[in-house]
Amino acid sequence: MTLFTQEQDGLTEESYKPKKLFTLEEANKTLPLVSRIIGDIVRVSSEMQSLHAEAERLAEEGRSVRAEEVRGRFEDLADQLTELAEELNAIGCVCKDPRVGLVDYPARMHDRVVFLCWKRGEKEIQFWHELQGGFAGRKKVKGALG
């Protein structure tokens, strides 16, 4: 199972079968919980990046015992990250970028499936994008859903 993915090339409505399609209202109602989970994901992801760099530095210095301790902590954090991603998946949304807290919610717009797109720090969902659009293709929700 892919927990986080920024890759959307080739994603089509025929190939993508979400377990739930959200309305804007439904997705916004999940934000208090999703925001807490994403906060943890961003924190754990950041700590993992730091530990990875530290483990490489320690290995280069020949401090293998300490490097193994750091690797062990890294693996614990990876397990936490998996659990957090599974919590999001259970809600029906997916984290697209654990470093900044980018989340997509599958939704139906007119006759097609799209993603409602939320980024950590935003008070509500204000953007959407096509399945293959990604963050760079975000458009304002206001007036688009109907």
Residue ranges of predicted features:
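Phosphate/adenylate-binding "loop-and-lid" substructures adjacent to NTP/NAD/dNTP-binding pockets
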Residues: Q80
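Long, hydrophobic N-terminal alpha-helical segment
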Residues: M1-R57
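Glycine-rich, aromatic-bearing surface loops/beta-hairpins
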Residues: E86, A90-G146
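Heptad-repeat coiled-coil alpha-helices
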Residues: S50, E54-R57, E61-S64, A90, ...
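Metal- and O2-centered redox machinery and metal/ROS homeostasis
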Residues: T2, E83-E86
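Amphipathic alpha-helical coiled-coil segments and their boundaries
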Residues: K20-T23, T30, I37, R63, ...
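Intrinsically disordered, low-complexity segments enriched in polar/charged residues with Gly/Pro
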Residues: E7-D9, F74, L102-D104
